[in-house]
């Protein structure tokens, strides 16, 4: 029986292109030149993901058979007793992706073929249009439409929306405060304004960026 290829090392690479904090995982194997890459990005808690990989998952992973991906995933998920949460899930995901990358290289096949093959030839993508007013958002949307873009995410007030000028009690911590009802009214007016000018052929998307509680999100959708 051939000797299995094992995990020799796990490296965590922190990088920040264009201001986006990314966590890249590189799994190095016992086979010279064979390695895999995965993404473990949790932008707001990248140091926590880095620690989870370096202090917990890396020692657990070294020496394991790279082909036994599901076994690693299951054991990594439960070996710490407490489980789940975005930090651990991102850390495990980065190594999991890297192991699939290795398996694809070993088979000389793209990973999607190992997972059953493609079912479509392409996927729709979107562009992001934001501005301080509905008119400013519409101006950007129209430029994208002229370029042939058909899926556009619209946001008024910049990334995550515009904070509200709410009266704060004495001692309230500094930060941005959001009135969910006002946010809903403001964004829906903007979306309606843009829709009335671009028609039904353009797909409009909106991301509330966790600004709304579930009940407010239901009202927004209705």
Language model: regions and residue ranges:
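Metal- or metallocofactor-binding catalytic centers and their adjacent structured scaffolds
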Residues: 31-106
């Amino acid at each position: 029986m051939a000797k299995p290829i094992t995990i020799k090392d796990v490296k965590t690479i922190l990088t920040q292109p264009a201001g986006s904090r990314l966590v890249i995982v590189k799994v190095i194997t016992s086979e010279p030149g064979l390695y895999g890459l995965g993404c473990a990005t949790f932008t707001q808690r990248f140091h926590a993901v880095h620690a989870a990989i370096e202090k917990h998952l890396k020692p657990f992973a070294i020496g394991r058979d790279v082909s036994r991906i599901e076994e690693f995933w299951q054991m990594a998920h439960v070996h710490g007793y407490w489980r789940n949460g975005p930090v651990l899930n991102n850390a495990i995901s980065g190594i999991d992706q890297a192991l699939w990358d290795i398996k694809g290289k070993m088979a000389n096949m793209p990973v999607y073929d190992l997972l059953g093959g493609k079912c479509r030839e392409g996927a729709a993508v979107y562009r992001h249009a934001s501005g301080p007013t509905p008119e400013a958002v519409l101006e950007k949307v129209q430029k994208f439409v002229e370029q042939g873009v058909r899926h556009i995410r619209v946001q008024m007030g910049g990334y995550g929306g515009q904070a509200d000028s709410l009266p704060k009690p004495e001692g309230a911590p500094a930060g941005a405060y959001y009135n969910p009802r006002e946010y809903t009214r403001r964004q829906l007016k903007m979306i309606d304004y843009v829709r009335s000018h671009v028609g039904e052929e353009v797909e409009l998307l909106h991301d509330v960026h966790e600004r709304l509680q579930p009940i407010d999100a239901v009202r927004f959708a209705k």
